[in-house]
Swiss-Prot record:
Has a glutathione-disulfide oxidoreductase activity in the presence of NADPH and glutathione reductase. Reduces low molecular weight disulfides and proteins. GO terms for molecular function: glutathione disulfide oxidoreductase activity. Pfam families: Glutaredoxin. Keywords: Acetylation, Cytoplasm, Disulfide bond, Electron transport, Redox-active center, Transport. The gene is GLRX. This is Glutaredoxin-1. Belongs to the glutaredoxin family. It comes from Sus scrofa (Pig).
């Protein structure tokens, strides 16, 4: 169930962030990404606490990415890590480049 749920969310050309709403790093990630000019429907925040499978989802994220912490940020099918990784990419100018490469920005 958790594996199918996660896999259904991760898609090429889209940015998906698995979050918990009470997590300060998740909120920071949401703030950063929400400031960028995404095309409609190509940025999705998935609240993993809204399901009864929160632990299973985190276990599968661990299998998939090497970490079960949130946020887990996927650009297309690739996990780039969490909040700190996203901020580093943004500071280096790599984030906008990657988002343009997958066609996610207006």
């Amino acid at each position: 169930m958790a594996q199918a749920f996660v896999n259904s969310k991760i898609q090429p050309g889209k940015v998906v962030v698995f979050i918990k709403p009470t997590c300060p790093f998740c909120r920071k990630t949401q703030e950063l990404l929400s400031q960028l000019p995404f095309k409609e429907g190509l940025l999705e925040f998935v609240d993993i606490t809204a399901t009864s499978d929160t632990n299973e989802i985190q276990d599968y994220l661990q299998q998939l990415t090497g970490a079960r912490t949130v946020p887990r940020v996927f650009i297309g099918k690739e996990c780039i890590g969490g909040c700190t990784d996203l901020e580093s990419m943004h500071k280096r100018g790599e984030l906008l480049t990657r988002l343009q490469q997958i066609g996610a920005l207006k």
